[in-house]
Amino acid sequence: YKILKGLVYRALFFCMNIIHRGIANKKLKENCFKSFKESFNKKYGIETDIHFTKDNKIICFHDFTLNRLFKINKSIKNLTYDEIKSNTKLKISVPLLKDVLKLSKKRYLVLIEIKPILNLRNIKILLNEIKNYKNCIIISFKHTNLFKIRKINKKVKIGFSFAKNSKILDIIKTSSKKNYDCLILDKYFINNKSIQNIKKNKYFYTVKEKKEFLKYSKKNNLIFENL
């Protein structure tokens, strides 16, 4: 049983293509409950972003403010979850991470990107929230978040994120660290031999064209959108 269980979890993290912020189209908005549900229904994993509200609720939302999606110039960190719901209820619902995790049914990979730099208290809240979900990987461009996590928890899955302007030597140096699970890399690096030779699971973002998806998806883990 343990062997079979291990194989199931291994399958979650290999040859996997992930939908960026859930399915988004004319009917569905990014990082909303319905977009995640539709993604899971199509048997895809998801990537989502998280922020903490003023009352320490973890929400799935990309931006630091409500301005881009809702034309409301207010910061997430300065609003309670009820205030966010009140401000956005006529457009889309901003989901709690715990509800999205339940929706995944522990079957589909969930990449959880920490957007801000978190304090230790919030790190502990996040770890407690995901403790029963082995289908999660916590990722961040702000690597200090991941170092804090490792000091508290040696087993939770983590991944270092890198932008297009990252130096290859920095990526390789980070990849030599122990006790992490994957790298999240801009697709700019997908044809780089030094990067491909790194013996760690890698996810390349963000693929937006079907032709590009078909070209690379057989041999790479891709984070894609709107295909």
Predicted regions and their residues:
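Phosphate-group recognition and catalysis centered on beta-loop-alpha active-site segments
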Residues: 4-227
